[in-house]
Amino acid sequence: MKKSLIALAFGTLGLGIAEFTMMGILPYVATDLGISIPVAGHFISAYALGVCFGAPMLLLARKRPLKQILLVLMALMIVGNICASMAPNYWVLLLGRFVSGLPHGAYFGVASIVAGKLADKGKSSEAVSIMIAGMTVANLFGVPLGTSLSHTLSWRATFLLVGAWGLITLYYIWRWVPQVEGLKDTGFKGQFRFLKKPAPWLILGATALGNGGVFCWYSYITPLLTEVSGFSAESITALMVLAGFGMVVGNLVSGRMS
C-alpha cells in the first residue's frame, strides 16, 4: 500500500473522530459548561454548518496546488479542535466546532482526487476506498476511544487528541503526498453544470434525508441510552463500538448492493 494513501486516510480518520465524537460526549460537555443537552446539540450543528460553508469555499482555491490545499485544510482541523479543547464557554466551543467542520467536505473532495491520481492504472476506486477507510476506523474505534477518554479524563482531552492527530497527519501529508496535477479548471459556473441533470438532485436529496435520519438519533445517543434506555455511563463506550460496527457492515452491504 502506498504511504501517500495512508497519509490521506489519516486525515479522514481525524475528521471522522472530530465529527462524530461529540455524540458520545454531549452530556459531559453540557455539564461542564453549565448548559442543557439540547443546547449542547448546537455544537453538532455548528460542525455541520462548517461543512456546508467549507466545501463551497474550495471553489475559491481551485487553482491552488492540491497538496497545498490539503495542508491548509489539515491546519484548519488542528486549529478548530485545539480551540474546542480550551474553550472556556459556549461561544468559543461553538466557534471551534464551526472551524473544525470547515475542512471536512473539502478534504474528502480533494483527497479523493489526489488518491485517484496516485493510484495504479485501473485501481483508482480502490485507492479512494483506502482513503475513505479512515472514516470507517473512526466510527469503529476512534469515536468510542473519545467517549472513553471523556469518561475517564475530560471531554477536552478528546479534542486535544484530535488536534494532535491533525499535527501528525499534516506532517505525513507534507512528507508522503507528492504534488499532483489538479483537475481542469472549468471556471466558477462550470462547477455547477452537473446540477442541470435530475440524477445529482436525487442523490443529494437521498443523502440529505439519510443523514438527517441518522443524526436525529445519533446526535443524542448518549443521553438516550443512559436516561431513557437505562444503560450505565460505563457501558457507553462498548455501545458506541457496536454502533460503529453497524455502520461498517452497512457500508459493506450497500457497496455490494450498488
Predicted regions and their residues:
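Short hydrophobic/alpha-helical segments at membrane-entry points of transmembrane helices
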Residues: 89-97, 202-203
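Helix-loop-helix hairpin linking two adjacent transmembrane segments in secondary transporters
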Residues: 90-92, 121-122, 126-175, 220, ...
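Short hydrophobic/small-residue motifs within alpha-helical transmembrane segments
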Residues: 47-49, 136-137, 241-245
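Conserved MFS/SLC helix-loop-helix module at the cytosolic interface between two early adjacent transmembrane helices
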Residues: 53-91
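Helix-breaking motifs and short loop linkers at transmembrane-helix boundaries and internal kinks
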Residues: 34, 86-92, 230
